[in-house]
Amino acid sequence: LSLGDSYTIGESVCATCSFPEQLKDSLSINFKKDTTFSLQVIARTGWTTTNLINTIEQENITDDFDLVTLLIGVNNQFQQRNFSIYEKEFPELIATSIKAANDKKKNLIVVSIPDYAFTPFGRGSASISTEIDKYNDFAKNYCEQNGITFVNITDITREGLSNTGLVASDGLHPSKLAYTKFVERILPLAIAKLKE
């Protein structure tokens, strides 16, 4: 189960290029042939934490997922929502994610928010980076305090102006290559969790 926003659905890249799809394919390669992986994605471009919470409530998702990923927050920042909303709703989403993951927090992987300052759209804006850091620092600290796996991929996206191959054709979102690099970091942790 992958929860999030445009960074989860893979805005402006092919249907199988998103990080959850690439993760699913990579997991399939690393497990026996008779092991199949299915993927459910609850994500939409523009979603804030509030949008995600409201949709999850309507979706009535099951609570038997072996692996859950959560990547959320960029639209709280982009839409200049009050930071206190994230402070309240990120922990709510963590609790919901754990419930979906068989009530096992070890089955949850939280992924950091990419930094869109390092894209043609973001134009190297220092204020964007500072605000993204604030969100990621909160998420990282919360995860560390609660024994939840947090994977930092933000540094990969901060190479987007020097390595244009990391940015999708829309000049804003990560490319297939960037998502591949995300998966290189997520995959070993996912394999370990699934084999426990």
Regions found by a protein language model. Give the residues of each.
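Oxyanion-hole/transition-state-stabilizing segment in secreted/luminal serine hydrolases
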Residues: 49-88, 115
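Surface-exposed cleft-lining segments at the edges of enzyme active sites
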Residues: 41-44, 75-85, 123-127
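Structural recognition of the beta-strand scaffold that forms the well-ordered cores
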Residues: 1-2, 8, 38-43, 66-72, ...
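Catalytic His-Asp segment of secreted/periplasmic serine-dependent ester chemistry enzymes
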Residues: 115-196
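Serine-esterase "nucleophile elbow" of acetyl-processing enzymes
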Residues: 1-43, 57-63
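Solvent-exposed loop/turn segments at secondary-structure junctions
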Residues: 6-9, 44-49, 74-79, 114-119, ...
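A short helix->loop->beta-strand "cap" motif at the edges of active sites that frequently abuts
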Residues: 98-107
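Charged helix-capping and loop-helix junction motifs
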Residues: 84-93, 131-135
